[in-house]
């Protein structure tokens, strides 16, 4: 399922906050969100279940939980704006949903940077069937 989503994103482009999130990831880590984080471990990419494979995957787990706390928002499509001030990500004022989505994405991008040393290519394109259990935030 995740692979299908990745192909769809590549074919139709990325809209909404996914575009901003990808930009944040690149700025913080020097890595392109696709393919580096689009299907990494059990939580990076669409959906998630099981135990995070490493600290990088845990960043995605926390990010999924953050989005889960925004039931009235559309994190994949609602656009927000941010800027950098002295190298730091600053979410610009928007709607309540835009602000909260931006803060979730900001935390994940920073988490990825802080855990670059745990990033392992063996978890890129990680198969879903190896991830067992439910998401428990």
UniProtKB/Swiss-Prot annotation:
It catalyses: a 1,2-diacyl-sn-glycero-3-phosphocholine + H2O = a 1-acyl-sn-glycero-3-phosphocholine + a fatty acid + H(+). One of its GO terms (cellular component) is extracellular region. Disulfide bonds join 42-131, 44-60, 59-111, 65-137, 66-104, 73-97, 91-102. This is Basic phospholipase A2 DsM-S1. The keyword Protein biosynthesis does not apply. Keywords: Disulfide bond, Hydrolase, Lipid degradation, Lipid metabolism, Metal-binding, Neurotoxin, Secreted, Signal, Toxin. CDD domains: PLA2c.
């Amino acid at each position: 399922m995740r692979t299908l989503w990745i192909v769809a994103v590549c074919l139709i482009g990325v809209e909404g906050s996914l575009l901003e999130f990808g930009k944040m990831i690149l700025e913080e880590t020097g890595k392109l969100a696709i393919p580096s984080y689009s299907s990494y471990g059990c939580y990076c990419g669409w959906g998630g279940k099981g135990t995070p494979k490493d600290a990088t995957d845990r960043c995605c787990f926390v990010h999924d939980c953050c989005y889960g706390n925004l039931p009235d928002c559309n994190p994949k499509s609602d656009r927000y704006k941010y800027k950098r001030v002295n190298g730091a990500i600053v979410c610009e004022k928007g709607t309540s949903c835009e602000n909260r989505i931006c803060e979730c994405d900001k935390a994940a991008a920073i988490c990825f940077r802080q855990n670059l040393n745990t990033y392992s290519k063996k978890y890129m394109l990680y198969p879903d069937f190896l991830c067992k259990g439910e998401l428990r935030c």
